[in-house]
Amino acid sequence: MRHIAVVYKRMRPEAARLAQDIKSWLAKRNVLVFCMENIDSAGVLSSHQRVDFPQDTDLVIVLGGDGTLLSVARLIESRKIPVIGVNLGGMGFLTGITIDNCYMELERILGGDYEIEERMRLRVLVRREHREIFSHRVLNDAVINKGALARIIDLVTVIDGRFLTHYRGDGLIFSTPTGSTAYNLAAGGPIVFPTAQAIIITPICSFTLTNRPIIFPSHVIIRIELGEPIKDVTLTCDGQVGCLLAPSDRIVITAAANPLRLIKTPTVDHFEILRNKLKWGQA
């Protein structure tokens, strides 16, 4: 790898210092480094376009938490640039490298001692009166939920053209396996191995107590409509972008064509991450 981009939040001094240290470290190894610092305090890269990454970028190093990496995943879109995250945030399910082992892991990567995991993403479309008004790829999840003062919402759910059910409650989470340890887990959904190919539907505070999360194969087409006209229903993608839904909108969710290419070194163990982050086996 000879061309590497480093992305970090400029609002965090420790991230800026680490970015410059990594840049100097890589330069000594004859690597050209491109630093992207224009990220707001929420980790959102809304001001950037895909062309901001040079065409010959071999790797993107993300300094921050999972939210920053989610923004980078959206920024990359369909480009096949591999990504590695250095955790400066909280849980860090996606950013598996720590500051302590950062340079050891980068040395492994430069030496070719790594594998690339393909993490499936979802494509989320909103159609209104035969027009496509919203389209995004998500790495973690898409969430349909009601506003703070709205009543229970009714979401008519159709899978591959066949009616599934009316979900009545506070909303629905549509999660990838990568996102299964995020909002999906907090809402009582299952943990799915991150490289699996599946779409998880998890109800949020379902009015019907027998409604439970369902795991679907990744090839299904999911269509959602509002069963009753109601205001203040929102679609949110990866917790960062979204739109207000109109009563006649149709939401279509499928597996995206281009997965995110996430670098994994031999020292990263998904089961160890689960044990540490979720404190399994600890008194």
From Swiss-Prot:
<feature type="binding site">
    <location>
        <begin position="140"/>
        <end position="141"/>
    </location>
    <ligand>
        <name>NAD(+)</name>
    </ligand>
</feature>
<protein>
    <recommendedName>
        <fullName>NAD kinase</fullName>
        <ecNumber>2.7.1.23</ecNumber>
    </recommendedName>
</protein>
<dbReference type="Pfam" id="PF20143">
    <property type="entry name" value="NAD_kinase_C"/>
</dbReference>
<comment type="function">
    <text>Involved in the regulation of the intracellular balance of NAD and NADP, and is a key enzyme in the biosynthesis of NADP. Catalyzes specifically the phosphorylation on 2'-hydroxyl of the adenosine moiety of NAD to yield NADP.</text>
</comment>
<dbReference type="GO" id="GO:0006741">
    <property type="term" value="P:NADP biosynthetic process"/>
</dbReference>
<keyword id="KW-0547">Nucleotide-binding</keyword>
<dbReference type="GO" id="GO:0051287">
    <property type="term" value="F:NAD binding"/>
</dbReference>
<dbReference type="InterPro" id="IPR017437">
    <property type="entry name" value="ATP-NAD_kinase_PpnK-typ_C"/>
</dbReference>
<keyword id="KW-0521">NADP</keyword>
<dbReference type="GO" id="GO:0046872">
    <property type="term" value="F:metal ion binding"/>
</dbReference>
<dbReference type="GO" id="GO:0019674">
    <property type="term" value="P:NAD metabolic process"/>
</dbReference>
<dbReference type="Pfam" id="PF01513">
    <property type="entry name" value="NAD_kinase"/>
</dbReference>
<keyword id="KW-0418">Kinase</keyword>
<dbReference type="GO" id="GO:0005524">
    <property type="term" value="F:ATP binding"/>
</dbReference>
<dbReference type="InterPro" id="IPR016064">
    <property type="entry name" value="NAD/diacylglycerol_kinase_sf"/>
</dbReference>
<feature type="binding site">
    <location>
        <position position="170"/>
    </location>
    <ligand>
        <name>NAD(+)</name>
    </ligand>
</feature>
<feature type="binding site">
    <location>
        <position position="168"/>
    </location>
    <ligand>
        <name>NAD(+)</name>
    </ligand>
</feature>
<keyword id="KW-0067">ATP-binding</keyword>
<keyword id="KW-0808">Transferase</keyword>
<keyword id="KW-0963">Cytoplasm</keyword>
<comment type="similarity">
    <text>Belongs to the NAD kinase family.</text>
</comment>
<feature type="binding site">
    <location>
        <begin position="66"/>
        <end position="67"/>
    </location>
    <ligand>
        <name>NAD(+)</name>
    </ligand>
</feature>
<feature type="active site" description="Proton acceptor">
    <location>
        <position position="66"/>
    </location>
</feature>
<dbReference type="InterPro" id="IPR017438">
    <property type="entry name" value="ATP-NAD_kinase_N"/>
</dbReference>
<keyword id="KW-0520">NAD</keyword>
<feature type="binding site">
    <location>
        <position position="151"/>
    </location>
    <ligand>
        <name>NAD(+)</name>
    </ligand>
</feature>
<dbReference type="InterPro" id="IPR002504">
    <property type="entry name" value="NADK"/>
</dbReference>
<feature type="binding site">
    <location>
        <position position="240"/>
    </location>
    <ligand>
        <name>NAD(+)</name>
    </ligand>
</feature>
<dbReference type="GO" id="GO:0003951">
    <property type="term" value="F:NAD+ kinase activity"/>
</dbReference>
<dbReference type="GO" id="GO:0005737">
    <property type="term" value="C:cytoplasm"/>
</dbReference>
